[in-house]
Amino acid sequence: GSIYAKVRKINVQGGVSIPIADLKPTAHWITEAKSSDDQKASAKNSVTFNYYGLECKISQSILANVVTLKMFTDLFVPMATEAMVKAIEIAIFNGTGEGQPLGVLKDSRVTAVITLTPEEYASWNGWHKVKGKMKKAYRNGSFVMNQSTFDTGIDGMEDKNGQPIGRTNYGVNGEETYRFMGKNVETVEDDVLPSWDDANEGDVIAVFMNFSDYVINTNMEMQVVKWTDHDNNKIKNKCLMVVDGKVADAAGIILVKKGVTAV
């Protein structure tokens, strides 16, 4: 849930076209005689959020419910919440935009792509191509990659001067944090991004982005519903929320793809 916690969250009416400027405002210098132009400026780009339902449902027999009601109730909500957050995080990157949020990898507005050969992937010079693509205004972003990609390919990498650029930091509480080329790294599971070893040619193996440039819109916060299905002697529980998500600003997002060995 670390990625879901970092993306921007709003609550606006679905179906309404929202100018990007409203989601990513800019400040302007003014004088006593001249007010800011934003009063008459119009944004060329906009996003529209839809109504997509996400639910996690489970049932148990009435007999089992009598025996384990409190235990089941205590477990269901956190388990359902975890499952729904995981589904949203997968959609943030791989969502098709049809019946679910539009993911970063599927958004045609994300055009910055760097392809690394195996030799480049394993070297500072190769990843320096990615750093050179980072725009100044967006350099406070983070890398997103598979845990295996970081552990086997990035951790311990050195620059041309022998200085480590990929490393694992261990906090006083034992929690691991990852850094690469001066940027934070968020590691994900295989269902979000494949590892370098498992990826096919042309697959995205890493993303550089500022998480606040992706917006999650909820029209109905997570609700828990419980009812009895007397025909089947089942007690049913479900968590339900209405959510959509889209990239608000694609200018700072970079996709890193797997290439083939240069000949």
Indicate residue ranges for each PLM-predicted region.
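Assembly/oligomerization interface modules of large self-assembling protein complexes
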Residues: 1-56
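Protruding loop/beta-arch "assembly-hinge" segments enriched in small, turn-prone residues
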Residues: 3, 7-10, 26-27, 225-263
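Extended oligomerization regions of viral-like shell subunits
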Residues: 12, 103-235, 239-241, 263
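Extended, low-charge hydrophobic alpha-helical regions
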Residues: 48-66, 157
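Short, charged, low-complexity patches
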Residues: 69-77, 81
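Short, glycine/acidic-rich hinge or "gate" loops at secondary-structure transitions
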Residues: 90-105
